[in-house]
């Protein structure tokens, strides 16, 4: 019979593996070659390298996210500024008719004094502060980007230059945006270069000198005639 309290042999069914981790072989006395994975600290070095790679990857992801956010922020600010400019331009455009009425009143002398003058001055000051600029004056060069010609005098031949002769309605510009083109009448003028102008001036000077010489000669002749008449006759 088998005793129920008999303990099983500790060596039965179990295999014990003993690993000699000594770096020096006790039999040969030489240093053993240990694979990197089996060296003490080899696992730690591999973990450190893996950690560095992971940190570099996460750092690159963070930098990319930061760049994307910076671009988004710039785009949002740009869109916000564009929306504000459109709203401001829309409001100012509604007041251009009021400015036209005030300009007509100014030409008739109705804004020389009184409460209306104060209102007009304050409105002009406020719109100027917003960046509103009026353009279109007689004598300015005609610019099709800013001006709309409703009249044209001249043949527009070679050497001519179109300038504004009359202004029917002023134009307005808010920043770089043209809110309204100026209605103008265009007159073609002849462009004279510096050489032609100098030659014309020289010719005028020569003509003036010749006229002065002729006048001096005439005065000298008159003087001699008067002296001859004033001298007594020898007979």
UniProtKB/Swiss-Prot annotation:
Compositionally biased residues, Basic and acidic residues: 19-35
Protein name stated in the entry: Protein GrpE
Gene: grpE
Function, in words: Participates actively in the response to hyperosmotic and heat shock by preventing the aggregation of stress-denatured proteins, in association with DnaK and GrpE. It is the nucleotide exchange factor for DnaK and may function as a thermosensor. Unfolded proteins bind initially to DnaJ; upon interaction with the DnaJ-bound protein, DnaK hydrolyzes its bound ATP, resulting in the formation of a stable complex. GrpE releases ADP from DnaK; ATP binding to DnaK triggers the release of the substrate protein, thus completing the reaction cycle.
Source organism superkingdom: Bacteria
Origin organism lineage: Bacteria, Bacillati, Actinomycetota, Actinomycetes, Mycobacteriales
Gene source species: Mycobacterium bovis (strain ATCC BAA-935 / AF2122/97)
Cellular component aspect of the GO annotation: cytoplasm
InterPro entries membership: GrpE (IPR000740), GrpE_coiled_coil (IPR013805), GrpE_head (IPR009012)
CDD domains: GrpE
